[in-house]
């Protein structure tokens, strides 16, 4: 399959990847090009910027969660009908799992998808040294995939000389520069980037940025480079089923799954939801903040992560919803809760002001704030009681902890001997801090939907018995 594509990477975090990616995406959309965007790694927030503010179809591609075939399948699934796919890297280009490998790095994704890479270089304080810097990235790996360079924070006066220098000395195309643009800065917060709805006039800022990039980037050259990306051998879904039969599961009946979706609960992978639908789920979105009870006739409940700690007061005030969720879960409704959703299930949850808010009361004890990131990064979950789920790749990123994290799974860090017990896995409840990506282990959604169907049948039998 021919998918025009590029990957924007950098030597380090804070080099301008997100800003330039957003500006480029907006410029492509302005040109009326059907554009797909992808974030390398597990981050939720950048794809929300891409999709909600710019309007591109945006997904994650993560080679820790998925092998090469699944990664290429997801790329084709989400970009096969687009004119260009733009991938945004993560951290430094070669930085991967454990801090000592390139596994799950932007380089790893470029290798798995055979994608041309444009290296974004923060050029502040450098001139000729830029050539040495870029040369190091080009030569660190024989197959670096780096075919273009963009200079960030460069003056218009210096750019022509630096472009000439690099193109003469290195086998790489310089595709433009970005001057310092103070009024287009994206503000930061404790989880990385703020939500798009919280940045005043963000669309205005990106509109201005895209106008600047139209003048300072060689967008035609970027499109030409993307068009040179090699054809990919893309597996079809039946190939995934042959490798893991769980992908072939289809619920015998449609099951209604409630999905928490508002300003407090907004961290979910779109590919997770589409896989649930493919397996026979009808997704019913609701708001734990604004609705007073769960939607009717649900067979299962998804409580994803987000920012419940920023909405503690309103969540506590909505005791009708807390009671509705507690009664449903205690009554046997299957519930899958991750990170912020897990925090919300506690008896008490600390908010950002240090107040402990009374919430759902399903999990005993309280979730509380910690002074730094707690158990950050990729993990592999192993179930202790072995119900057939196997190993589950997962990810944690949170500034909160719990008096009762659960002990039904063991989490182990890749490239490390460190590990800990975590997760509640009792009856039809699966809850804890780890974030799950269903394409990494499709047995997780299958198990959830089987429980939902069982719960649906139980309710139907009970209803029939009452007639």
What are these regions (language model features)?
Residues 2-19, 25-113, 121-148, 153-161:
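ATP-dependent carboxylate-amine ligase catalytic core
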Residues 5, 33-36, 254-256, 282, ...:
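Residues that mark the start of a beta-strand
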Residues 39, 174-182, 282-290:
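Beta-strand->loop->alpha-helix junctions that form or flank phosphate-binding loops
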Residues 110, 215, 253, 265-277, ...:
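C-terminal and late-domain segments of enzyme folds
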Residues 115, 172, 330-334:
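A short helix->loop->beta-strand "cap" motif at the edges of active sites that frequently abuts
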Residues 127-247:
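Internal gly/pro-rich beta-alpha loop/helix module
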Residues 255-319, 323-328:
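Phosphate-binding active sites in nucleotide-utilizing proteins
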Residues 308-383:
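Cysteine-nucleophile active-site neighborhood
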